[in-house]
Amino acid sequence: MNPASPFATLTDRIDWQKVDGLVPAIVQDFQSSQVLMMGYMNPEALQKTLDTQQVTFFSRSKQRLWTKGETSGHVLQLKNIALDCDQDTLLVKVNPIGPTCHTGTVTCWDGDAQEESQMVWLHQLEQLLAERKNADPSSSYTASLYARGTKRIAQKVGEEGVEVALAATAGDKEELICESADLMYHLLVLLQEQGLAMNDVINKLKERHK
């Protein structure tokens, strides 16, 4: 962490007396915005998180610092951290390496209790498409597309774009939805093949919206 970073003074801004020395830290996937878990940090845990760029908590049961993934390898790589307006809660945005929950699930919350947002699902689809990049071409349609390279994938994006336009021109809404899904899928594959992600596109849209 750069000493000149605004995060360097974060520890001093927290109202530690108000939180009895342990500040709640809500952990969120920086790409999908899915809430992954909640833990507690004392000043030492927060400082270690900032210094190592891996999320560390204070374990209330073990009464010691605990770096997430220290035994499983499923660490939480720090991407951003923010203090709320009351100076008593942290929002920690991370890149999770593997499942976050000790049960092996992505999040520590019950899947039925946490409604899955479209962006979370889209991110999970991107992860699946990324995994298929090095898979046997005979194992799936996606893997076979990667094997045929940029030209073929780009051709499919163009073909599906035409199908979307034709469906819209015909006024067939159901077909428009289906063809749009095909277009989105092939576009995501193309982005992955080029080392990009939907977040790159969203960030460009945000930039243009300013």
From Swiss-Prot:
InterPro entries: His_synth_HisIE (IPR023019), HisE (IPR008179), PRib-ATP_PPHydrolase-like (IPR021130), PRib_AMP_CycHydrolase_dom (IPR002496), PRib_AMP_CycHydrolase_sf (IPR038019). It comes from Vibrio cholerae serotype O1 (strain ATCC 39315 / El Tor Inaba N16961). This is Histidine biosynthesis bifunctional protein HisIE. It is found in: Cytoplasm. The keyword Nucleotide-binding applies. The gene is hisI. The lineage of its organism: Bacteria, Pseudomonadati, Pseudomonadota, Gammaproteobacteria, Vibrionales. Keywords: Amino-acid biosynthesis, ATP-binding, Cytoplasm, Histidine biosynthesis, Hydrolase, Multifunctional enzyme, Nucleotide-binding. Residues 122-210 are annotated as: Phosphoribosyl-ATP pyrophosphohydrolase. Pathway: Amino-acid biosynthesis; L-histidine biosynthesis; L-histidine from 5-phospho-alpha-D-ribose 1-diphosphate: step 2/9; Amino-acid biosynthesis; L-histidine biosynthesis; L-histidine from 5-phospho-alpha-D-ribose 1-diphosphate: step 3/9. Residues 1-121 are annotated as: Phosphoribosyl-AMP cyclohydrolase. It comes from the Bacteria. One of its GO terms (biological process) is L-histidine biosynthetic process. One of its GO terms (molecular function) is phosphoribosyl-ATP diphosphatase activity. Its EC number is 3.5.4.19, 3.6.1.31. It is an enzyme of class 3 (hydrolase). It holds the Pfam family PRA-CH. In the N-terminal section; belongs to the PRA-CH family. It catalyses: 1-(5-phospho-beta-D-ribosyl)-ATP + H2O = 1-(5-phospho-beta-D-ribosyl)-5'-AMP + diphosphate + H(+); 1-(5-phospho-beta-D-ribosyl)-5'-AMP + H2O = 1-(5-phospho-beta-D-ribosyl)-5-[(5-phospho-beta-D-ribosylamino)methylideneamino]imidazole-4-carboxamide.
